Amino acid sequence: RFSVPDKESAEAVEEIKNKTNVPLVADIHFDYRLALMCIERGIDKVRINPGNIGGEENAEAVAKAAAAKNIPIRIGVNAGSLEKGLLDKCGGDLPKAMVESAKRHVEILNRFDFDNIVLSMKSSNVAATVKAYRLASQTFDYPLHLGVTEAGTIKQGIVKSCLLYTSPS
């Protein structure tokens, strides 16, 4: 996965793909048109952040382009960029708010007959992340991309990842 913050980065997808056989995931924030550019250039998966991708019409454009090329979309919910007011609506329950955010965006993509979806629920708080993934696994029938966000230094990241992946049921 690599960040695609601008047009130049999106234009580089084809060149990068020609130099590797590893599947590439474009991490898109704010500008849905960058996702469209990456899809046109053969990206293997697009990751969008429901908290900052823009309106429903933007999601529709990305869903239609991805569907035409059978490219999955990862809905990447990040605790730090939940939709305004969602955490309050969920009574301050962060894992519940994260799953609610994913649910909203799954429903949007499903309205456009798109269901080639992978979900992630990331927080820098390992306990909240584990709870969000457990709730997501009970709520959705989509693959889950596991991970933490803002993991910190290499050592901190290893510890947080180990805690996430070995958390008892």
Placement of each model-derived feature along the sequence:
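Glycine-rich, proline-tolerant flexible connector loops at the mouths of alpha/beta enzymes
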Residues: 1-15, 50-53, 117-120
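Hydrophobic faces of well-ordered beta-strands that scaffold small-molecule active sites
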Residues: 1-2, 24-26, 46-48, 73, ...
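N-terminal active-site wall of soluble small-molecule enzyme domains
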Residues: 3-41
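Glycine-enriched alpha-helix->loop->beta-strand junction motifs that scaffold or abut catalytic
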Residues: 20-22, 40-46, 67-69, 138-142
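Structured alpha-helical segments in the cores of large, soluble enzyme domains
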Residues: 35, 62, 95-110, 129-138, ...
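Active-site glycine- and acidic-residue-rich loops that bind
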Residues: 50-57, 120-130, 153-159
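Conserved anion-binding
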Residues: 54-112
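Conserved small/polar residues in nucleotide/adenosyl-binding loops
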Residues: 165-169
